[in-house]
């Protein structure tokens, strides 16, 4: 069984599959569809974070699922989805083979569609935008974090899973999809998007000068895909050669992605120290450490907002708790659960919540987020205004760094 770590507006960790437990009946007596249902049940039984399985008898759930007529893959998929729905966890979900392949492409650095990172609100159940991908049709149309997607092509999203919603927004380049959007304090409105190829180069970098003429390296990281760590390391190296004396790392509207990518990026800024703790259902802790030489020890400010989620929060929390960076902006999204992706025997996939994470100071940020050292709220700005005088959070970060550079210069 193959395993793979991935992101989806959400944060995932490598996990290995061990023993499986017993069948409800001898393996030879099971159809392929029943074997698939049992395969999913065993993975959840072994790995799921909540050992009460949402306060239900998980063995009974298996028995009920296998008693249903499962005459084709679609029937098996339906039984699996119903079984997982009983956990009341939007992050533990089944992906049919097409959805699984699409998710693998998403984390590889290539994507086509409207460019939305989405999540189900665990309290309201509504389908929400985590963030639009930079330069995507969704961003160009003005979609924002926390926007509610009420309908897709006229169909209510009320009972859709994440993957069903994502599938309805996918389609050929140049095709149209209509969304009904709800935004707090505003009337519902329809937005028409034209699907396109989404560029997933995760790093934007350039050297800037503070009002006092101090060279500041500006880095914007848009997501943690397979290319993120390598691209960021290259950008830091280039800025160091150009004489950067301090850095701004912009994680605003970064929905996360691959956990390992977040850890690798944290190691680029830390010589030592804990990056993150993971806690499984037995309460056992694992941890990831920085062990090596940081790419730079220059002063660092991280920009965050409510669209900063998952792996972005791991990075921000690690550098804040280790005293390596100051955070400026708004409280982050609050996604502190870890999923692992399992490839199933028929080519479909299963994402399972297997653990939660804590920052180095043992903060559990799930549904709470990370509070910045300096809170600066601001109205949404255009992509062209990011990092300009119109960007109050960026200007506040420059001010913090300028003071740090003055202190360093007077020692």
Model segments located where?
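PDZ/PDZ-like domain segments forming the peptide/carboxylate-binding groove
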Residues: 109-151, 155-158, 226, 355
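Terminal peptide-recognition signature
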Residues: 40, 79, 83, 116, ...
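Conserved functional hotspot residues or short segments at active or partner-binding sites
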Residues: 365, 384-388, 392-411
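Sec-exported extracytoplasmic/periplasmic mature domains
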Residues: 41-49, 63-70, 79-92, 151-154, ...
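Extended, small/polar residue-biased N-terminal targeting/export presequences
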Residues: 52-126, 176-177, 183-205, 406-409
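Cleft-lining beta-strand/loop regions that shape enzyme active-site pockets
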Residues: 139, 153-156, 163-335, 339-340
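Terminal targeting/pro-maturation regions of precursor/exported proteins
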Residues: 2-93
């Amino acid at each position: 069984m193959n395993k793979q770590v991935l992101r989806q507006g959400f944060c995932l960790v490598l996990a290995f599959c061990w023993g499986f437990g017993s069948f409800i009946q001898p393996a030879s007596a099971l159809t392929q569809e029943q074997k698939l249902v049992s395969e999913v049940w065993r993975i959840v039984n072994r790995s799921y974070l909540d050992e009460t399985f949402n306060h239900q008898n998980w063995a009974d759930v298996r028995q009920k699922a296998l008693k249903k007529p499962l005459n084709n893959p679609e029937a098996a998929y339906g039984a699996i989805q119903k079984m997982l729905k009983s956990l009341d966890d939007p992050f533990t979900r089944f992906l049919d083979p097409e959805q699984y392949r699409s998710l693998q492409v998403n984390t590889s650095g290539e994507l086509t569609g409207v460019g939305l990172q989405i999540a189900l609100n665990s309290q309201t159940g509504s389908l929400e935008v985590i963030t639009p991908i930079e330069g995507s049709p969704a961003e160009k149309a003005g979609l924002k974090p926390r926007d509610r997607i009420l309908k897709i092509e006229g169909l209510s999203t009320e009972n859709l899973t994440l993957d069903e919603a994502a599938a309805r927004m996918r389609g050929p380049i140049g095709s149209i999809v209509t969304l009904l959007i709800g935004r707090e304090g505003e009337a519902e409105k329809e937005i028409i998007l034209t699907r396109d190829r989404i560029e997933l180069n995760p790093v934007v970098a350039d050297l800037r000068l503070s009002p006092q003429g101090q060279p500041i390296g500006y880095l914007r990281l848009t997501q943690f895909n397979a290319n993120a760590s390598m691209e960021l390391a290259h950008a830091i190296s280039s800025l160091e050669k150009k004489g950067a004396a301090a850095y701004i790392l912009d994680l605003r509207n970064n929905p996360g992605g691959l956990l390992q990518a977040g850890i690798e990026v944290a190691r680029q800024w830390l010589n030592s120290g804990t990056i993150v703790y993971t806690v499984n259902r037995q309460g056992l802790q694992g941890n990831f450490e920085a062990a090596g030489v940081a790419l730079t020890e220059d002063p660092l400010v991280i920009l965050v907002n409510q669209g900063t989620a998952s792996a972005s929060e791991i990075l921000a929390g690690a550098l804040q708790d280790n005293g390596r960076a100051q955070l400026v902006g708004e409280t982050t999204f609050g996604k502190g659960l870890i999923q692992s992706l399992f490839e199933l025997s028929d080519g479909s996939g299963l994402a399972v919540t297997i653990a939660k994470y804590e920052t180095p100071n043992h903060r559990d940020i799930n549904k709470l987020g990370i509070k910045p050292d300096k809170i600066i709220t601001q109205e949404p700005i255009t992509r062209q205004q990011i990092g300009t005088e119109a960007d109050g959070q960026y200007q506040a970060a420059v001010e913090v760094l300028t003071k740090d550079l003055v202190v360093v210069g007077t020692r």
